Every structure is written in C-alpha cells, then in structure tokens.
Amino acid sequence: MNFTILIIDDEKNIREGLGTALELEGYDVKLAENGEIGLKLIEKGDIDLVITDLRMPGISGEEVIAKVTGESPGIPVIVLTGHGSIDSAVTAMRNGA
C-alpha cells in the first residue's frame, strides 16, 4: 500500500509542481483546487497526509485543518502558504496543523 498525499491549493502551478515532485519520490498524490474538493477527497478515505494552503476562495485552509483534525484526527496536516504571518501560524497550529 502506497502513502497518499492530498495537496489542496488554489494556485495551479504550486499544486501541480509539488504533486509532480512528490510523485517522482514515489508517493501517490491527489490534487484539489479548493477546500471543498479537498474535504470530499478526504471523506472518500485513503489519504495519509494533507498539505494545504491557508488562503483559498470558499473553504479556507483553516477550515480544512479544523475539519480534518476534528473528524479524521489520524491524518497529519502540513500548511504551505505564501501568506505567512505569526497569527496565521498560531491559528493553524491551534487547529492541529
């Protein structure tokens, strides 16, 4: 069984570039362009790790983190964002990232 990583990011170049790099390392990768699609993929199962942006239209990365840690606490979450601030980092960590 392979390790499956879900990448949630509204920036296509980041999402696809990171996905390709991880696939070259032997990981199974699923891509989602927003939080809503990402949460649907998580609900289907078979996700071992989530990498999410914070600032996305619709369901934000913060909401994704809260939902994953609340409903699927065994799935670790990594935040990858260009909108870094101390407040964003603290909020993400408080939510379980």
Regions found by a protein language model. Name each.
Residues 12-30:
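Two-component/phosphorelay signaling modules centered on CheY-like receiver
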Residues 40, 62-74, 91-94:
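Short amphipathic alpha-helix used as the core "switch/output" element in two-component signaling
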Residues 56:
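Receiver (REC) domain active-site loop signature in two-component systems and cognate sites
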Residues 71, 83-84:
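Short, conserved "switch-loop" micro-motifs in signal-transduction and mechanochemical regulators
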Residues 6, 31-49:
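Acidic, metal-coordinating helix/loop segments flanking the phosphotransfer/catalytic sites
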Residues 2, 46-48, 71-76:
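His-Asp phosphorelay/catalytic-motif detector in bacterial-type signaling
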Residues 9, 53, 81:
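Active-site residues of response regulator receiver
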Residues 3, 34-37, 60-63:
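Acidic catalytic/metal-coordinating carboxylates
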